[in-house]
């Protein structure tokens, strides 16, 4: 697959299913790339896949696309040393790739089954931006006949919170959109906070839409539980200690980073994500189970080794 064909396939996957996470679309694209690859050696195939991941990250610079691609490559490569015949090995790699895709497609349902039990009848939930996993959790709570209401931040600069509010109104869930600046004001009315994550880092912290960190700080100050829901393919080998440690390639949109190469200054741009430290997080709900932030490093090691 040429670069243009790869990018077009990735974009078509995203357009075909709006509920699909960008990381899942990237993994589907990589699987298709693997099937079409004309390479004749394992080393060449691995190099081609690595380049394909880099190309996709240039289209969508989210943490999840990077970590999902790396985990996909790691998972399919585990059997590469067991077979001397290249065609046999490639066939096994494709089978493992399809297995990996099936596993991650079940992630949201597993998380929803774990997390919705923490939502009590009459709960007032605060959430941030648009998260497909959070939406799936709330759908499960609605299916369980629980009555609850949701406060959601509008989430500048793309107003993705309004998109989330619209999705919740279709479920007949009482929802109130609040200003990003009103998080401290509204926190005293909330019983718990549930947010998604673009990436879960090695120390148990998260990288998510800008504004998540201030919400976690407010929740901690007012002793409200702060829950994170995220699929395991978002676990990334990164160890930030503060906002400056988050790489620019994750902080900014791919288009913004390209414009910087033409001379534009990044200081004039607003970051799209921020880092929330593990000390502010109560629990993480993943398809691997319910984890404390301190348990994330153990699970991450299992995934990457």
Curated annotation (Swiss-Prot):
The keyword Transmembrane helix does not apply. It holds the Pfam family IF-2B. Gene3D superfamilies: Translation initiation factor eif-2b, domain 2, Translation initiation factor eIF-2B, N-terminal domain. GO terms for biological process: cytoplasmic translational initiation; oligodendrocyte development; T cell receptor signaling pathway; translational initiation. SUPFAM superfamilies: NagB/RpiA/CoA transferase-like (SSF100950). Activated by the chemical integrated stress response (ISR) inhibitor ISRIB which stimulates guanine nucleotide exchange factor activity for both phosphorylated and unphosphorylated eIF2. GO terms for cellular component: cytoplasm; cytosol; eukaryotic translation initiation factor 2B complex; membrane; plasma membrane. One of its GO terms (molecular function) is identical protein binding. Keywords: Acetylation, Cytoplasm, Initiation factor, Protein biosynthesis. Acts as a component of the translation initiation factor 2B (eIF2B) complex, which catalyzes the exchange of GDP for GTP on eukaryotic initiation factor 2 (eIF2) gamma subunit. Its guanine nucleotide exchange factor activity is repressed when bound to eIF2 complex phosphorylated on the alpha subunit, thereby limiting the amount of methionyl-initiator methionine tRNA available to the ribosome and consequently global translation is repressed. Component of the translation initiation factor 2B (eIF2B) complex which is a heterodecamer of two sets of five different subunits: alpha, beta, gamma, delta and epsilon. Subunits alpha, beta and delta comprise a regulatory subcomplex and subunits epsilon and gamma comprise a catalytic subcomplex. Within the complex, the hexameric regulatory complex resides at the center, with the two heterodimeric catalytic subcomplexes bound on opposite sides. This is Translation initiation factor eIF2B subunit alpha. It comes from Mus musculus. The lineage of its organism: Eukaryota, Metazoa, Chordata, Craniata, Vertebrata. The gene is Eif2b1.
């Amino acid at each position: 697959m040429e670069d243009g064909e790869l990018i077009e396939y990735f974009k078509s996957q995203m357009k075909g299913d709006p509920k699909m996470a960008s990381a899942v679309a990237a993994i589907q694209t990589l699987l298709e790339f693997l099937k079409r690859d004309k390479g004749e050696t394992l080393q060449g195939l691995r190099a081609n896949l690595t380049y394909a991941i880099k190309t996709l990250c240039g289209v969508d610079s989210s943490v999840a696309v990077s970590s999902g691609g790396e985990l996909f490559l790691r998972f399919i490569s585990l059997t590469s040393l067991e077979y001397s015949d290249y065609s046999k090995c490639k066939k096994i790699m494709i089978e493992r790739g399809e297995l990996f895709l099936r596993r991650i497609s079940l992630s949201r349902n597993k998380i929803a089954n774990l997390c919705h039990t923490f939502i009590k009848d009459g709960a007032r939930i605060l959430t941030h931006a648009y998260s497909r996993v959070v939406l799936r959790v709330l759908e499960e709570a609605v299916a369980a006949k629980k009555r609850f209401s949701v406060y959601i931040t509008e989430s500048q600069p793309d107003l993705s919170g309004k998109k989330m509010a619209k999705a919740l109104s279709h479920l007949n869930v009482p929802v109130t959109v609040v200003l990003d600046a009103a998080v401290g004001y509204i926190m005293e009315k909330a019983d718990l906070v549930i947010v998604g994550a673009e990436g879960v880092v090695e120390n148990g912290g998260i990288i998510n839409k800008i504004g998540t960190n201030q919400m976690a700080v407010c929740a901690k100050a007012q002793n409200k539980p702060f829950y994170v829901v995220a699929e395991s393919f978002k676990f990334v080998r990164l160890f930030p200690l503060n906002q400056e440690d988050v790489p620019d390639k994750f902080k900014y949109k791919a288009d913004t980073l390209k414009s910087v190469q033409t001379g534009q200054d990044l200081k004039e741009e607003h970051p799209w994500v921020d880092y929330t430290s593990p000390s502010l997080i109560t629990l993480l709900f993943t398809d691997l189970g319910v984890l404390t932030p301190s348990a994330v490093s153990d699970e991450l090691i299992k995934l990457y080794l």
